[in-house]
Amino acid sequence: MNSNFKLIADNLHFSEGPRWKDGKLWFSDFYHHAVMTADEMGNVEKIVDVPNQPSGLGWLPNGDLIIVSMLDRKLLKFKDGNLTEHADMSKLTPFRCNDMVVDKNGNAYVGNFGSIHHGKDIKPTVLIKVDSNGNSSIAASNLDFPNGTVITPDGKKLIIGETYAGRLTAFDLDTDGNLSNRRVWAVSYTH
């Protein structure tokens, strides 16, 4: 097998939340505090600065970019060159928010670190749902560092990685964006 790799971007600090849209790889470089894009020719562009570390990225049905702001636990909207608050998730979790996936109706599902950076034992945390109008609620609880979330192509299942549990957990996703029928989808290791 002959594989050819081409470096398309360097001098990045910690790239996170990759998404492919409009022929470009969109990502957060959270130690640079910026959302960036890279195309296949190696053209890298800073889209917007996010002072409190960007992470998960997604788009609302109208095309507006939404960005998880990690340190202040907010979901920001970037439209017409302006960054505004879409939702404040700080009352739902005291921990840094991170990865996100957005369904076809504009419901965003945002994970968070849990207690890992507070010098305490790891404790389960929540998955937050933010609807397209910016209303936030808890979608699921008792997750061990929810991260790496996807929605299946048919839009009927949400699968989330539980980093510290070594498993993928699946939920059924209804047309209103509610989760049900929680189950283990795969296990990568046991403790």
Please place each PLM-identified region on the residue numbering:
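Beta-rich catalytic cores
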Residues: 14, 53, 96, 123, ...
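Short loop/turn segments immediately following beta-strands, especially the blade-tip
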Residues: 171-177
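Conserved beta-strand positions in repeat-built beta-propeller and related beta-rich domains
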Residues: 11, 25-31, 65-72, 108-121, ...
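Asp-box/WD-like beta-propeller blade repeats and closely related beta-sheet repeat scaffolds
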Residues: 82-104, 113-115
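Residue-level detector of Asp-centered blade-edge/turn motifs that repeat once per structural unit
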Residues: 20-22, 60-62, 102-105, 153-154
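A short loop-to-beta-strand structural motif that recurs across blades of beta-propeller domains
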Residues: 34-36, 74-76, 126-128, 167-169
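Conserved small/polar residues in nucleotide/adenosyl-binding loops
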Residues: 190-191
